[in-house]
Amino acid sequence: EIMPSLVGSEMCIRDRQHINAACGKDTIAYHRDLAGSFMASADNAHAFHPAHAEKYDPKSRVYMNGGVVIKQSANQKYTTDAVSEAVTKMICEKAGVPCQVFANHADIPGGSTLGAILNSLVSVTSVDIGMAQLAMHSPYETAGAKDTAYLVQFAKTFYETTLVRTEHGFSLEEK
């Protein structure tokens, strides 16, 4: 059985191929475009909860109203790598918004995003980001109001910036 999110990811890839074809680009141009692309997969992150401190890695706790969360996973449940984390931090700095880094506690499984599913089908430099929140997937999810403004400002700056692939990663340029 094919997961619905996987079908959506495959559709995203096909749509991108159709757009390239409509613009008169061939398969080589499609792959060149992918190599220079950068994807931000936005979902929320688990904010530190003082009543359950043992469930959090002590060096990567994230807090509500603490800024955009960059999510990483040694098990590759998130798409973030060193390059995409560095680019995201540069965009946050340019946007004037704080950022924080989240990693799951080593012995507690968790995490996975649609970005990781899409990235399993097509290799694009990508980052998993979000806002810190408590009670994820419950009827009483709680997040910080400042984080909404931070994420909006990050997204605005992200879309107003041209990322240029370089030998060592990416550079940021104004559009």
Annotate each predicted stretch with a short phrase:
Residues 1-8, 12:
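Single conserved hydrophobic/aromatic residue that forms the stacking wall/gate
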Residues 10-67, 71:
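A glycine- and small/hydrophobic-rich beta-loop-beta segment
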Residues 10-13, 82, 108, 145, ...:
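Conserved structured core elements
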Residues 13-17, 85, 89, 115, ...:
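Predominant activation on well-ordered alpha-helical scaffold segments within soluble catalytic domains
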Residues 16-24, 49, 92, 96, ...:
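Structural signal for hydrophobic packing residues in well-ordered secondary-structure cores
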Residues 25-36, 95-106, 163-173:
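Flexible, glycine/charged-enriched surface loops at secondary-structure junctions
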Residues 45-52, 56-140, 166:
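Active-site-adjacent substrate-binding region
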Residues 131-175:
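His/Asp/Glu-rich mid-to-C-terminal helical/loop segments that flank catalytic regions of hydrolases
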